[in-house]
């Protein structure tokens, strides 16, 4: 669990997301409240439930990115799902309980990786021993006394020399034959939507088929070390303990990001099949959000303390179009701002992994130095903003399209520019994008 203060969380989010201070503050406080709740004594701790968040704002302004980065900071099980994928129980499609089942799968994988990292060092030593046993088989004991001891000392010295060479990577390309444990047979079962529970049960019946069997393989030492380290680490783990920790992690720290929640609102009051289905999904979501117990293959999972972050553009609907019970379960509402030209400029250069840095790094692999002048950045931001205004507003995602079109020729002919420097200024931007951005019909298809 993260022990960062809200200010530290916002500072970390600022490295990746431009603007949206209100949304960042809301999620930072929600995450800090997780830690605060853990410090409260029982039985009051059980009564403190997370305050779910509803983010309202157009596409491409950072709603999903804020939730994704937050989960990374919290090191928490996180799942992003589109509300439109789910249907009311009885209709063809996925039911909302599968959200928790998917989340617990993510948590088990995350917990297993964490536990394996803890024993990685010991597992690596054991894997090295197994490789050295193949490279240097133990000599058969011949005689007793001083001569046997001397032979043993020589063998140990040789073994240490080989271990040193193994760790330095000098033996990486040498091939050896090993008995490697076969993974359990995975079964892919195609089933109708809504029958995930049944397929899970069938899959678990066959999950142990083939496990424990060993296969003799010829592999390079570098690959053998990785395979054997994973095998030794897996032996050290207690599967039941991993499952228990994973369930606890979901119950206490899980984050569910419900995207496109505005698409399941009732847009008129005349009813109709579609409206019934949309309202049905909301009613199915309600117990999940307010706290229920879901049966999974890892045991019962309570959703009382899972944090739900919902988001939607709400162009054709309003938050008040959600059923009243669901509205009440999202007490914190945050409106995200549309992006300005200045925001676009900052997105291009100011974040830790900005688009400009990404393209500079990509072209540097072919010895092409890409430089962006300030006026070039400004012009690029202006064009992206103008195209958004004239056509469909897709927010910061427009920058991907614009910069790809801008660098199309340079990327294509990068091999011919090796050792050269390419400067992107406003003149270069206008030459590459000017005609396309001015012609509304053309920009609708190209940008």
Curated annotation (Swiss-Prot):
One Gene Ontology term, aspect cellular component: HslUV protease complex
Bridged cysteine pairs (disulfide): none
Predominant cellular place of this UniProt entry's protein: cytoplasm
Subcellular location as annotated: Cytoplasm
Keywords: ATP-binding, Chaperone, Cytoplasm, Nucleotide-binding, Stress response
Residues given in the record as ATP binding sites: 18, 60-65, 259, 325, 397
Entry annotated with the keyword Nucleotide-binding: yes
Pfam families on file: AAA (PF00004), AAA_2 (PF07724)
SUPFAM superfamilies in the cross-refs: P-loop containing nucleoside triphosphate hydrolases
NCBIfam families linked to this entry: hslU, PRK05201.1
Purpose of the protein: ATPase subunit of a proteasome-like degradation complex; this subunit has chaperone activity. The binding of ATP and its subsequent hydrolysis by HslU are essential for unfolding of protein substrates subsequently hydrolyzed by HslV. HslU recognizes the N-terminal part of its protein substrates and unfolds these before they are guided to HslV for hydrolysis.
Subunit details: A double ring-shaped homohexamer of HslV is capped on each side by a ring-shaped HslU homohexamer. The assembly of the HslU/HslV complex is dependent on binding of ATP.
Protein name (Swiss-Prot/TrEMBL): ATP-dependent protease ATPase subunit HslU
Gene source species: Burkholderia pseudomallei (strain 1710b)
Lineage: Bacteria, Pseudomonadati, Pseudomonadota, Betaproteobacteria, Burkholderiales
Gene name for this UniProt entry: hslU
